Regions:
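Acidic, proline/glycine-rich low-complexity IDRs
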Residues: 1-36, 66-133
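Amphipathic, interaction-prone secondary-structure segments
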Residues: 33-73
């Protein structure tokens, strides 16, 4: 199965916005490289549709997942309770760190599982509860 994706460059630590089409294994390899670096940002979508786009931003064991459903609507996936109530976590969004409250922070492995499920099903609704921004 192929997927369109763009991600942080492990070599330079900056987001490389040029999308590439590849098999899921290549995306998984990039994600694993970024895990070794400790942080990263990945955007994925179907090769046949511009939307929806799912993004995964992570730093260490903490991640945030965004859903861009169309050119004007964006959502955050509700967190899984990995951080204490009222805690904030910083993750890289494109090339800058952004802070998110515990309401939207997930375990990085769980967030990667969400991305993987999205790639397989091309559907965002079954992935969890979304809050519109």
């Amino acid at each position: 199965m192929s997927v369109m994706w763009a991600a942080t460059s492990p070599e330079f630590g900056l987001f490389h916005p040029v999308e590439r089409r590849s098999e899921v294994k290549d995306l998984s390899d990039r994600f694993n490289d970024l895990r070794s670096c400790g942080q990263g940002y990945v955007e994925v979508r179907s090769p046949t549709r511009e939307f929806p786009v799912l993004s995964l931003a992570f730093r260490g064991d903490h991640a945030v997942v965004h859903l861009i459903s169309d050119a004007e609507r964006m959502f955050l996936l509700v967190g899984d309770g990995i951080v204490p109530s009222s805690a904030e976590v910083e993750v890289p969004i494109v090339d800058d760190l952004a802070a998110f409250t515990d309401d939207f922070v997930l375990d990085t492995d769980r967030a990667w599982g969400v991305v993987h499920d999205f790639i397989q099903t091309r559907a965002a609704d079954p992935l969890g509860e979304w809050r519109e921004l």
